Amino acid sequence: MSESERSEASEVFGTSPDSRLSSEDAAELEQLRREAAILREQLEDAGGLATSARAARDVHQLEARIDSLAARNAKLMDTLKEARQQLLALREEVDRLGQPPSGYGVLLSVQDDETVDVFTSGRKMRLTCSPNIETKELKKGQTVRLNEALTVVEAGHFESVGEISTLREILSDGHRALVVGHADEERIVWLAEPLVAAEHLPEGSYADEDDLTDDRPRKLRPGDSLLVDTKAGYAFERIPKAEVEDLVLEEVPDVSYNDIGGLGRQIEQIRDAVELPFLHKELYREYSLRPPKGVLLYGPPGCGKTLIAKAVANSLAKKMAEVRGDDAREAKSYFLNIKGPELLNKFVGETERHIRLIFQRAREKASEGTPVIVFFDEMDSIFRTRGTGVSSDVETTVVPQLLSEIDGVEGLENVIVIGASNREDMIDPAILRPGRLDVKIKIERPDAESAQDIFSKYLTEELPIHDDDLAEFSGDRSLTIKAMIEKVVDRMYAEIDDNRFLEVTYANGDKEVMYFKDFNSGAMIQNVVDRAKKNAIKAVLETGQRGLRIQHLLDSIIDEFAENEDLPNTTNPDDWARISGKKGERIVYIRTLVTGKSSSASRAIDTESNLGQYL
């Protein structure tokens, strides 16, 4: 390309229309313009009409060709601009790919000269910040990005992954904490700025520990799980996973004493033991009477031990609200339901630690003046008599831990321990002595009168009753329900052959026939009513006749007894002896008396070996 052509090409990006043409097109265009000018002169000189028309046509063709060339050159210019933009983008991509890698670190502190201390690659370093970084906005514990010259060029978020440690205590400066990590290793860590800020919030401006819908910061407390970077020595956030929450159900139960039938005497006992000390503290102080620290509810399964414990928490909350003048609907108490078997842990010391956390949580709740019920269900599975373990001796350390919590140096103000068990003989005697579980209440199997009371909780006037049954009592629903309950209880407690269950032979040669009533429970009564309701529903679907009938209940009793024919396989012989009034007598022989059972052969029980709860 000649110099003139290069100069013409360099003018392609000019502002004049001609400067946008290539050199060849510009020359051709100039030639066309000269021809057009000549033709115009000829047209002006020629006077003939034909010559004028031909010249005008030629001029029009030349102008059309000029427009076509101009459009083609404009398109070429657009293509050139697009290519230039793509080249620039590729150059930026090449530059980006060629940049050295960036490092990350944890900000430890900001100095007065706007340098910062950063922990990166296992080292603590003092670095400078890019002018784009506002050092005043940096927060301790924050992640920062470093360039190849180890200059802070970007501020990131707080670390979201790491190890979990348990907070032991916050040190006096409020910026450091003692945490316990893996294998009970203790270390001091710095608290990231969000955690420090939560500790200095004024009263009422932070979230309640149990309100999961509140997004405000929460104050730290011992036992909390913290996300920790052990290398940088920083704790970043509180993880809402206190280990005790897996084993504890914090709730305000909705069970009242009115929901419990047939246990009036036991309810009065537990109200005297639990509610009086809470509601009349001044009288107890006046008489120098120490409130009981714990209550043991023992008896056969399914007789209402857990229901009573829940009702205590509910009633106590309402009574405390009345004393304080608060709204009964906002009554507050805590029922810590400990899942006994899940409390056990295969690692040495873990079970004891969970027990400490549970009582620590209870003390925190109770410090606010709120009653706290710590309920240990199946207490015999956790606090068994020391020295009786067959494959392990875990009870030798778990039992002392509970004893130290109940009557240790730290008092249990506003905390009551309630234990429930159907094998109270297996619980360590040190727990059952006065001063620990002071009050022991036996929840017995219901007699006929108690059974009627329990039935009345499930058979209410609101239930649909069959018209034929209502007609017998002139449509009076109350009398109908009462008659149904009486008939059902009479059938259930009748000493007839159909109700015979077992023949027990004692070591002294005495024999005794036991009936199904001797093994009745509130749970069985509820099951009978539920079966009857199901039969009534099936009758509606099959015949269209609505309503519960007495026959549905009687049939349910037969079905329930039939399902419990194997009850001897799951009942403790010592319990049978207590029911029959022959305490201390060994059972040496059992014969089932259930009619129509194919496998009703007599069965001897070897009482020399330790049978435990299950035969």
From Swiss-Prot:
Taxonomic superkingdom: Bacteria
Keyword Nucleus: no
GO molecular function, one term: ATP hydrolysis activity
Keyword annotations: ATP-binding, Chaperone, Coiled coil, Nucleotide-binding, Proteasome
Keyword Zinc-finger: no
Residues given in the record as ATP binding sites: 302-307
Ranges for region Disordered: 1-27
Listed InterPro entries: AAA+_ATPase (IPR003593), AAA_ATPase_domain (IPR050168), ATPase_AAA_core (IPR003959), ATPase_AAA_CS (IPR003960), NA-bd_OB-fold (IPR012340), P-loop_NTPase (IPR027417), Prot_ATP_ID_OB_2nd (IPR032501), Prot_ATP_ID_OB_N (IPR041626)
Gene Ontology BP terms: modification-dependent protein catabolic process; proteasomal protein catabolic process
Metabolic or biological pathway: Protein degradation; proteasomal Pup-dependent pathway
HAMAP family assigned: ARC_ATPase (MF_02112)
PANTHER family per the UniProt record, alphabetical: AAA-FAMILY ATPASE (PTHR23077), PROTEASOME-ASSOCIATED ATPASE (PTHR23077:SF144)
Domain comment in the entry: Consists of three main regions, an N-terminal coiled-coil domain that binds to protein Pup and functions as a docking station, an interdomain involved in ARC hexamerization, and a C-terminal ATPase domain of the AAA type.
Family, per entry: Belongs to the AAA ATPase family.
Subunit structure: Homohexamer. Assembles into a hexameric ring structure that caps the 20S proteasome core. Strongly interacts with the prokaryotic ubiquitin-like protein Pup through a hydrophobic interface; the interacting region of ARC lies in its N-terminal coiled-coil domain. There is one Pup binding site per ARC hexamer ring. Upon ATP-binding, the C-terminus of ARC interacts with the alpha-rings of the proteasome core, possibly by binding to the intersubunit pockets.
Primary role: ATPase which is responsible for recognizing, binding, unfolding and translocation of pupylated proteins into the bacterial 20S proteasome core particle. May be essential for opening the gate of the 20S proteasome via an interaction with its C-terminus, thereby allowing substrate entry and access to the site of proteolysis. Thus, the C-termini of the proteasomal ATPase may function like a 'key in a lock' to induce gate opening and therefore regulate proteolysis.
Designated name of the protein: Proteasome-associated ATPase
Gene: mpa
